């Protein structure tokens, strides 16, 4: 089973790239972060044409996560952490594979720091 993860930084802006990726690599599951769209504007048809089903926990303009799969996904959970700011950052699901259940956890966690800050931290302290 091939499971991929991709911060797409807007699923609608990258739909051509996503379709090309799915055609070329044919992952069983693709977990996307920062989809930046609500369910109402998610490109379900573009994904379904490639024989994938989509499960979306979206948010307008920011955040948002999705799991797309060739196989049936069960027990989809959205908003499992009660976020008072209502940020769509985590979606979980179960999938059966070879008589076992695999728990998929897709989380969008921005670090909020510039890359130069992280580089300096690693360089000076080894963190």
Region locations from a protein language model:
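N-terminal, active-site-proximal structural segment of metallo-dependent hydrolase catalytic domains
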Residues: 1-53, 62-65
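Soluble or luminal CAZymes and related metallo-dependent hydrolases
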Residues: 10-14, 85, 120-122
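Nucleotide phosphate-binding site architecture
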Residues: 12, 74, 125
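Structured beta-strand-rich core segments of catalytic domains in phosphoester-bond hydrolases
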Residues: 35-38, 42-112
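Single conserved hydrophobic/aromatic residue that forms the stacking wall/gate
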Residues: 116-127
């Amino acid at each position: 089973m091939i499971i991929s993860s991709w911060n797409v930084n807007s699923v609608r802006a990258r739909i051509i790239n996503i379709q090309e990726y799915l055609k070329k690599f044919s992952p069983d599951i693709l977990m996307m972060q920062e989809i930046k769209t609500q369910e109402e504007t998610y490109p379900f048809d573009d994904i379904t044409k490639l024989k994938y089903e989509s499960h979306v926990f979206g948010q307008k303009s920011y955040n948002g996560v999705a799991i797309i799969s060739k196989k049936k996904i069960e027990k989809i959970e959205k908003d499992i952490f009660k976020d008072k700011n209502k940020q769509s950052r985590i979606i979980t699901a179960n999938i059966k594979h070879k008589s076992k259940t695999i728990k998929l956890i897709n989380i969008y966690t921005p670090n909020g720091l510039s890359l130069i800050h992280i580089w300096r931290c690693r360089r000076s302290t080894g963190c």
